[in-house]
Amino acid sequence: MRFDLERPSQNATSHRVAVLLINLGTPDAPTPRAVRRYLAQFLSDPRVVEIPALLWQIILRLLILPFRGSASAKKYAAVWMPEGSPLRVYTEKQVEGLRHLLQLNDYTVLVDYAMRYGTPGIPAMLNQLKLAGAERVLLMPMYPQYSSSTTATAFDDAFSALKRMRNQPEIRTVRQYADHPAYIAALAAQVHQYWHQHGRPDFAAGDKLVLSFHGVPKRTLDLGDPYHEQCQQTGALLMQALELTPVECRITFQSRFGKAEWLQPYTAPTLKELGAAGVRRADVFCPGFTADCLETIEEIGMEVRDEFLHAGGKDFHRIPCLNASQAWIAALGEIVAQNLQGWPVQALPVPHTTGA
């Protein structure tokens, strides 16, 4: 194996600790070409689509990308912000917020982000952190619930990059934080803040809160993936924090792709049923998404909203994701700090010397 060319190691005093936030990814632009390039990388991941590679590539290249690229580009264009993709914009704000919080607490760590698909990639960012002097790196996936198709593939990509390094940094990983008290508190704070600004649903009159998590094929649950259990755990803890019952609050799964059975109940049909049953108001919150993106803004805020209203519902609210809220940055800082314990994250005091 040929290893990457590296510059000589630096003086030990420059060796630093780094935190790398990792999210799924986003196209570089809301254009068919950029979206096809992004989807080709995303849907070629064997942890995302567990179908024999040769058969799947034929289906992907001939039947999916030529059509889905253009359709998805229109959806991305509908949510694109002046600064760029919502996921990238909010992720960069999370990096800024976490970096500032750690600096206030005298941490000298580097903080940056990478995307599993698209740019900036995980291998490129690991190399960039090494060049900046990082000898220890904490991989912090922005997926609170562990799944093979999200958390594991991010770690795969990082470890593959390490295989090509002659001088590897020390690595720690955050596997999941689905039940972390700070994360649950940040979720509850986000919901309460929205209700304070827009009014609380009248649960006594039948209004509902729906907690929508990203779906995965049901087959992964049967094969031992803990994602479903951890989503249920997060949902139950959030309901408890909000003092809601399972009648007032539902847990659903969105973003189904293909014809196979995915985790149920599905989000869109659930909202359609609620609207048809006479539910006046439905609020939807996505606890598994730490930053707003296509799946929350367009799928929930537009498509699912229309399903509910067309079925007879009167008032639909999409509660924004955690994004860079003060409560989430504080929670993120707490989770990161706990996982940095034992590493030299604070500057050593400069020895005081006296003249002769």
Swiss-Prot record:
State the reactions this protein catalyses.
heme b + 2 H(+) = protoporphyrin IX + Fe(2+)
Q: Where in the cell is it found?
A: Cytoplasm
Asked if the keyword Cell inner membrane belongs to this entry, the reply reads no
Enzyme Commission number, as recorded = 4.98.1.1
Which Pfam family, any one, appears in the UniProt record?
Ferrochelatase
In terms of domain of life, where is this protein from?
Answer: Bacteria
Name the pathway: Porphyrin-containing compound metabolism; protoheme biosynthesis; protoheme from protoporphyrin-IX: step 1/1
What is the enzyme's main class? lyase
Q: Which residues bind Fe cation?
A: H214, E295
Iron found in the keyword field: yes
UniProt GO cellular component terms:
cytoplasm
Q: Name one GO molecular function term.
A: ferrochelatase activity
One Gene Ontology BP term is: heme biosynthetic process
* Keyword tags: Cytoplasm, Heme biosynthesis, Iron, Lyase, Metal-binding, Porphyrin biosynthesis
What is the recorded function of this protein according to its Swiss-Prot or TrEMBL entry?
Answer: Catalyzes the ferrous insertion into protoporphyrin IX.
Family to which this protein belongs = Belongs to the ferrochelatase family.
**Protein name in UniProt:** Ferrochelatase
Please tell me the species this chain comes from: Paraburkholderia xenovorans (strain LB400)
Q: Which gene encodes it?
A: hemH
